[in-house]
């Protein structure tokens, strides 16, 4: 595939481009291949599941470890997506002045649709599902009184969440910071990264913000693997261990 990107996956690696995505094991054996036509593919991987969507397009492919795939037609432009370890997919979809956060079952059926607006909740910039797909975290960016603030909200799609408006069970605000990344690391541990701070959350039902660290330097990039997060600054790298 021309213009390909490689990602570590299972006992090998994924290769994806505008034309398709494939899984090759470390021995060089082609395990599966999914063709498509996308202008700007974005990929989410969790355990053996892979979700690939067309940024600003309307299609998502939800692919299991054996290569079985389900095509999801979102009907709206995809801005971001996340897959859980059981194949549940969450996607941020733009619809004019409204932005939707839809959750789809592995069958491709829409299970949840959350309506957001810039005035009420802010603009969702990042979404992530817990491994079991029961919790979802969303990082919002909102303008208020001439400055920007970020909001990290958690949704519970299980019984507990039914007692809350829009299933939102907890939410945390951070002034004068932009949080472009919010990620789950398992079923009950999650983290978010802003331009000048790092937050850690824990909870099986109602996640709590248990740790907040302000950074002296602005974060240039973030990489995560397993229980570790690496922060890339201007010329230096710092590692943080996540409690499982």
Label each residue range with its predicted role.
Residues 100-174:
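Solenoidal tandem-repeat scaffolds enriched in leucines and small polar residues
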Residues 240-244:
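Conserved small/polar residues in nucleotide/adenosyl-binding loops
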Residues 1-48, 53-56:
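N-terminal "mature head" segments of proteins
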Residues 2-5, 38-45, 76-84, 121-128, ...:
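Repeated scaffold domains used in trafficking and secretory/extracellular systems
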């Amino acid at each position: 595939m021309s213009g390909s990107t490689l990602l570590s996956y299972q006992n090998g690696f994924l290769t994806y481009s505008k034309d398709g995505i494939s899984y090759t094991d470390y021995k060089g054996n082609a395990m599966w291949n999914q063709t498509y036509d996308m202008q700007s593919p974005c990929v989410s991987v969790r355990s053996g599941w892979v979700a690939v969507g067309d940024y600003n397009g309307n299609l998502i492919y939800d692919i299991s470890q054996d290569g079985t795939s389900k095509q999801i037609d979102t009907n709206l432009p995809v801005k971001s997506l996340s897959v859980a370890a059981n194949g549940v997919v969450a996607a941020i979809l733009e619809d004019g002045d409204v932005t939707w956060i839809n959750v789809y079952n592995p069958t491709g059926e829409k299970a949840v649709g959350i309506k957001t607006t810039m005035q009420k909740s802010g603009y969702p910039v990042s979404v992530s599902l817990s491994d079991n797909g029961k919790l979802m975290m969303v990082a919002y960016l909102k303008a208020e009184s001439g400055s920007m603030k970020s909001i990290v909200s958690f949704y519970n799609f299980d019984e507990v969440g039914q007692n809350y408006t829009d299933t939102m069970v907890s939410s945390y605000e951070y002034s004068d910071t932009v949080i472009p990344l919010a990620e789950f690391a398992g079923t009950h541990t999650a983290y978010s990264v802003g331009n000048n701070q790092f937050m850690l959350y824990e909870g099986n039902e109602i996640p709590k913000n248990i740790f907040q660290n302000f950074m002296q330097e602005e974060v240039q990039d973030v990489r995560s693997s397993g229980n570790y997060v690496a922060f890339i600054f201007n010329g230096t790298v710092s590692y943080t261990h996540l409690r499982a």
